[in-house]
Design a protein with these regions (language model features):
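Short beta-strand scaffold segments in enzyme catalytic cores
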Residues: 107-110
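Catalytic Cys-His active-site segments of thiol-dependent hydrolases/isopeptidases
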Residues: 117-124
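Glycine-centered tight beta-turn/hairpin loop motif at sheet-sheet or coil-to-beta transitions
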Residues: 114-116, 164
């Protein structure tokens, strides 16, 4: 039976009926989360507290209506999936996109059904459906082609973009918990040289994707039918209005 807290979380992402423990049900949850809960750095940019534990992340998302970064979004989503009866494993990943990354700075999820799937609701403009981990691919990620490269116990997620392969992140077989990401979270939120502290942003899917809206510090970007458009946004009141209009958030 779904708990009241899990039902409140489902309502937050726009789901008001039971979700089957199948890959289709998992995809529905992933797309709903990516649509309703933005990937954003507003608290980090403002110098406010953020934490990695679900005692922080679930209330932030469900009660305060905010988004967050990978530790909050994937940590909370892992809790929800567990409440719904999915088998979930938290992975520590090394981001391979520039700038250079430190080891295990990203939290991603492995979900076990009839196959093992990689799931992520905290990596910005990335795949939007579960990717089977027992098959190198390529796979239709809902937003483009993705595949895996296997080397020993390590797996690398690769996006096959129009300009060639783009390695996204690498992860192993270990299981991670919220405490394992505290040091990384604190370092990134406190260091003024980190990109997370440089300028605010928010991004989410539109209507389950792959259409997307992204608000950067000086412009609003929209992807519709595979084509991007953008318009300038002035910092201050205009930026705050765009944040409210597209994300129902205040800074």
């Amino acid at each position: 039976m779904t708990t009241p807290r899990a039902r409140a979380y489902l309502a937050r992402i726009g789901i008001d009926e039971p979700v089957a423990r199948t890959v289709d049900g998992l995809e529905r949850l992933q797309r709903a989360h990516l649509t309703r809960v933005p990937f954003e750095n507003l608290d980090v940019y403002a110098g406010r507290e953020v934490r990695t534990d679900i005692g922080w992340s679930v209330p932030k998302i469900v009660d305060r209506g905010r988004g967050g970064w990978c530790y909050e979004l994937n940590g909370a989503f892992a809790w929800l999936l567990g409440e719904l009866g999915f088998g979930v494993k938290q992975l520590g990943a090394t981001v391979l996109l520039p700038p250079a990354s430190t080891e295990f700075e990203h939290l991603a999820l492995e979900v076990a059904l009839e196959r093992r799937y990689l799931v992520d609701v905290g990596f910005g403009d990335s795949f939007i459906r579960p990717l089977p981990l027992d098959d190198a691919g390529p796979h239709d990620g809902g937003s483009g082609p993705y595949r895996f490269e296997f080397s020993g116990e390590d797996t690398t997620l690769v996006f096959d973009g129009p300009d060639g392969p783009e390695p996204q992140y690498r992860f192993g077989t270990g299981t991670f918990g919220a405490d394992d990401f505290v040091e990384q979270s604190e370092r990134k939120r406190r260091d003024p040289q980190q990109k997370w502290r440089q300028s605010p942003f928010a991004t989410r899917l539109l209507d389950g994707g792959p259409d997307r809206v992204t608000l950067l510090h000086d412009r609003l970007k929209l992807r519709r039918n595979g084509e991007w458009s953008e318009q300038p946004v002035q910092p201050g009141d205009e930026w705050d209005r765009a944040l409210r209009q597209w994300f129902d958030l205040v800074p």
